[in-house]
Amino acid sequence: MAENKAGTSNRGPMGGRGPMGGGRRMMQGGEKAKNFSGSFKKLIRYIGNYKFAILAVMIFAAISTVFSVAGPKVMGKATTALAEGLMKKIAGTGGIDFTRIGKILLLTLGLYLTSTVFNFLQGWIMTGVTQKICYRLRKEISEKINRMPMKYFESRTYGEVLSRITNDVDTLGQGLNQSVTQVITSTATLIGVVVMMLTISPLMTLIAFIILPVSAILMSTVVKFSQKYFRTQQEYLGHINGQVEESYGGHLVIKAFNKEKDMVKTFDETNGVLYESAWKSQFLSGLMQPIMAFVGNLGYAGVAISGGLLAIRGTIGVGDIQAFIQYVKNFTQPIQQIAQVINQVQSMTAASERVFEFLEEEEEDQEHEGAVSVENVTGEVKFFHVNFGYNPNQTIINDFSVDVKPGQKIAIVGPTGAGKTTMVKLLMRFYDVNSGQILLDNHDVRDYNRRDLRKAFGMVLQDTWLYKGTIMENIRYGRLDATDEEVIEAAKAAHADSFIRTLPGGYNMELNEDASTVSQGQKQLLTIARAILADSKVMILDEATSSVDTRTEALIQKAMDNLMEGRTSFVIAHRLSTIKNADVILVMKDGDIIEQGNHEELLAKGGFYAQLYNSQFEEAA
């Protein structure tokens, strides 16, 4: 299918949203998944493909933690040796054994260096795993997009779909990289620290443990109150993005109708709700760290007092107090880190939930066994008692029937909402009929593979869709294996060659993202050249001249005549003057064909077509 591709109006091929721009749904810390446990299990299964790498991360993290946890205990021996030496020196019975202290310090340095090396290794492996997962997810989403039915995209904004590829995958990757590593190291640190604390003093360990239930209660309370505000924040952030997108995309209409103040007022109301929910959610979330720090300081005080009493009794050494206080710090720090990870895990799981929801969406059936080949289609098309509605409860096309011979030019006219474009969508199987049949060369279109079927069609739309690249590349999009000479011949047939050669760089001129360096009429000629190059058997032209001036329309009409020559063509037109030479004109109203015939026959009938035609010329006069 020669598809009309480019981003001049941020709209995609059938008038729907295009793939670029607009409304990103940004992830915020603390957003909660609808089904946390289910989504988290899916995420675990997904990363199961990297279980050996994750296992290596866990082993290296554990080894790093063991060496790190042993450090304070060894350092405490140096402090004890120094204190004992000072006491002996004061008592006159000896002095400080610097050799012993030096060996202890070297051992401590070795422990921390080894810990750092293993920490680096686990971080390096985990980063690789995370990026591979993100790469794989983006690839799967990209492939999924091409298998999605048209109804999915027409029911959602392109910003929402774009967010799955960018924000959600990035949030998942960052959360996975940081939270998994943090959970492993924090858990290993907690276990190691508890063991070392117990070897120093069970009593001091018991005092330090008193802070655990207090911390858990305070943390769960804060999380409980903050969750509802995080959800409101995320919801209204989406509203903000949507309003900004609408304001940007429709700024000309907004200015033309003097609606700037109304738009600002609406935005301010939404922004106010976002501000309030964001302030409360961030404030409550920000309380976690100071609360945990306060509880931790209480633990330090209890440990210091009890340790001092035990040292006076000679139960433990001075270095043991130093080591224990360091362990208390190392004990509370992982708890604080886990508290921070909770919000991160929620965001990560919520992001993965949306990604997996998208990947599990219903797909179009692309291929089936025994499919009919489109290699030698002639372009004969039949609509046989077709009924269709986007909503099952509301029929748009009612018992539609028509026979189209190969090479015929069929014009479809009627008021907005009559079902003209819907007929094209059914023909190309963007949607399937509710009942009836559409035949291509006497085969039901459902007997063809969708991809093969669409190769038989070329399209030129009102909303030109060019992409960032050279003019040569944009025309060649119709047939990627075309030579430069074939591209130029197609441009000549489309009456585009002359204006292309006047541009800086000619065919090699680079178009920007919205193709604003060429006029609307020139864009249309380029898309016609692309369709000519594709050389499809059936052409579809949907309001191709509705957005250009009369002079440009005449040029485009000549190009369209060249394009349609020898091909079955369906022309959806608003300007009836452009379809006077059609073999058959189908006049649609409310999903029904109310009249059909050629231009002269329909005028002679004096019916609905004649009213439309005469009204247009009265307006022109």
What is each model feature region?
Residues A2-K5, E367-H368, V374-A621:
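ABC-type nucleotide-binding domain
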Residues G85, M196-I211, K280-E353, F358-L359:
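Helix-loop-helix
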Residues N49, A53-V66, K77, Q178-T232, ...:
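Transmembrane helices of ABC transporter permease
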Residues M150-K151, V169-L176, V180, A188, ...:
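An intracellular "coupling" helix at the cytosolic face of ABC transporter transmembrane type-1 domains
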Residues M26-E31, Q131, K139-S163, N167-V169, ...:
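Short intracellular "coupling" helices and adjacent cytoplasmic loop segments at the cytosolic face
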Residues N35-K51, V161:
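A short amphipathic helical element positioned immediately N-terminal to and/or at the very start
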Residues G48, L106, F118, Q122, ...:
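Hydrophobic alpha-helical transmembrane segments of ABC transporter permease domains
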Residues F36, I54-F118, T199-L203, G314-V318:
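Transmembrane helix-loop-helix hairpins at lipid-water interfaces of multipass membrane proteins
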